[in-house]
Amino acid sequence: MTAKSAAAAARATVYGYPRQGPNRELKKAIEGYWKGRVSAPELRSLAADLRAANWRRLADAGIDEVPAGDFSYYDHVLDTTVMVGAIPERHRAAVAADALDGYFAMARGTQEVAPLEMTKWFDTNYHYLVPELGPDTVFTADSTKQVTELAEAVALGLTARPVLVGPVTYLLLAKPAPGAPADFEPLTLLDRLLPVYAEVLTDLRAAGAEWVQLDEPAFVQDRTPAELNALERAYRELGALTDRPKLLVASYFDRLGDALPVLAKAPIEGLALDFTDAAATNLDALAAVGGLPGKRLVAGVVNGRNIWINDLQKSLSTLGTLLGLADRVDVSASCSLLHVPLDTGAERDIEPQILRWLAFARQKTAEIVTLAKGLAQGTDAITGELAASRADMASRAGSPITRNPAVRARAEAVTDDDARRSQPYAERTAAQRAHLGLPPLPTTTIGSFPQTGEIRAARADLRDGRIDIAGYEERIRAEIQEVISFQEKTGLDVLVHGEPERNDMVQYFAEQLTGYLATQHGWVQSYGTRYVRPPILAGDISRPEPMTVRWTTYAQSLTEKPVKGMLTGPVTMLAWSFVRDDQPLGDTARQVALALRDEVNDLEAAGTSVIQVDEPALRETLPLRAADHTAYLAWATEAFRLTTSGVRPDTQIHTHMCYAEFGDIVQAIDDLDADVISLEAARSHMQVAHELATHGYPREAGPGVYDIHSPRVPSAEEAAALLRTGLKAIPAERLWVNPDCGLKTRGWPETRASLENLVATARTLRGELSAS
């Protein structure tokens, strides 16, 4: 096919779409099901209606081929686990008794059975449930979900492409099952897994699928020759199947690297590549391997992870270059649109001009359709859209929101000494222990306490004008009193105020910092039914006034025990926001760090002796390619130290991280120079404690002993077992006792029981230590 004919054949498609519905209907229905207020048939009916509405919306917008199977009640990787029959032994009875309840038990756990581990989906803010595989794992195909959802789309008269997690990525995302040898590699199960995928592909072909998309994003990370060989073998074998659909292998989030020539030569019919941000180098790499002669290329030129409008002219230029490299070039987003909110049209509080800088899922869909039209019919067919794109981009570049001279001057004046504590840790820790007087194995929580219905109602009442600010603050003070009282009665050593005034750990600060924008309906899925509204970091950042001081000092007035000041760190403020793309991330991080530094200093001046600066996103924002790590970690750790280095030696700086693998950033954790770090560890059985010990981490640490992502209450015996494991890696004088993460999403009953068990565990082990 010539470049001209390839252009004429251009189609518009997407890899996936937000699942929740315009008003988060799916979240509400699932939580209603868990509480017994919604029946299983009602939940399934609502889910089918949401899928149909999404498909119709995409088709009406001009999408030629809609995705099927991207919908999920909880997580698409968990759906894949069900599809291949890799149900953990402890969950098989529940799944056999009731497939839906068993599915949710794998995701959330029960009082009797622990859930699957949860971790970040590559470097995004989405979480997946980690498959557990062992030498004895037997795979069996169950394509019910995939075939059913394809049939629903076909019944609407649509061209649909089923979307699956690819077999090699699935195995690379997995971990050894409990009881498996520690050195077991799930990838060794590829020969068992491929026949199951072959059966699913056959089922989908029989159900009418012309194309099936197999996602292999694991190969945008550095991979070994053995892993690349597994990729080659997988698609050589799947490609050799006779009765199968056409195969479109998709990658996203970064450049494909050494996997690109493997897939370019594979006996598949199509390849989907990301051409945004760091992945823009895929264009030159594709040319270097000779392109994709005789194959379909789906070009991800619209950024599926950020919310800024597309530079249509630049994207058309990229598409024009790609025309000579494949038999057919289609247009898409860089990844699933799962990672962005649904529609800017729902926003009423953002200035109309600024709103024109933004593109959520519906607007990105329109951009994709526009680009496909421009590619197929020429730029004359989209002159109006191109003119609007140029005007909106110029408006953003010239806005005073994006450039504040005072902020820029302060950031440029930062010196190395500004990001360095006045004394080394060995000297600081003695001053802190003398000042705080804490027992061995001190107990604390990570920050937030349950956000009850009463708290949410108070926030809604204030927003809707049913109460004034004085009435709202009275309710917040009452909640803080209750939280402090509970912690004192329970016997916790370092307290928190519970954060009842905070809607979200990033949004709360973003709403008080100049340069951020807030949305009303910009919800994106974090995990399961947990949705967040990432703020939009649109311009230069400054702090007009203190943000947390009065609530922290109020809480401290209620107790003699230390109350932690609680802040969200600069890297997490970026990672959990939609961040401006018109300057380097390190420059933006420095601006945020300086604003937070002022808050840290104000907290100390108000008498706060323990200040926690959370950086749960430090690891998840790590670039996917090792070649990019050093530059990222340099600015990320500097931003943290810039935030925290203005305090006295006897002020104890804490930080917190969660949701991630920490082994490859232990040096960076050390470079933060925090006095105490708390980490998620309960589901991974204290693995992080051993990683810290192997590195020789010299400071205090609190690997979590209570998994807060499950409603299950861990017994004191379970917590004690985890703590004893932690003590094998971290000396008692440097070990803290705490949950994995904040308690915002938990209910009070399990919170009370779990924290009482946590304190009892610490006291038991203190006794054992003193006896020894």
Swiss-Prot record:
Catalyzes the transfer of a methyl group from 5-methyltetrahydrofolate to homocysteine resulting in methionine formation. It comes from the Bacteria. It comes from Streptomyces coelicolor (strain ATCC BAA-471 / A3(2) / M145). GO terms for biological process: methionine biosynthetic process; methylation. 5-methyltetrahydropteroyltri-L-glutamate binds at residues 24-27, 120, 576, 620. Its cofactor is Zn(2+). It is an enzyme of class 2 (transferase). CDD domains: CIMS_C_terminal_like, CIMS_N_terminal_like. InterPro entries: Cbl-indep_Met_Synth_N, Cobalamin-indep_Met_synthase, Met_Synth_C/arc, UROD/MetE-like_sf. Zn(2+) binds at residues 656, 658, 680, 741. The keyword Aminoacyl-tRNA synthetase does not apply. Disulfide bonds: none annotated. Its EC number is 2.1.1.14. Keywords: Amino-acid biosynthesis, Metal-binding, Methionine biosynthesis, Methyltransferase, Repeat, Transferase, Zinc. L-homocysteine binds at residues 446-448, 499, 614. This is 5-methyltetrahydropteroyltriglutamate--homocysteine methyltransferase. Binds 1 zinc ion per subunit. GO terms for molecular function: 5-methyltetrahydropteroyltriglutamate-homocysteine S-methyltransferase activity; zinc ion binding. HAMAP family: Meth_synth. It holds the Pfam family Meth_synt_1. It catalyses: 5-methyltetrahydropteroyltri-L-glutamate + L-homocysteine = tetrahydropteroyltri-L-glutamate + L-methionine.
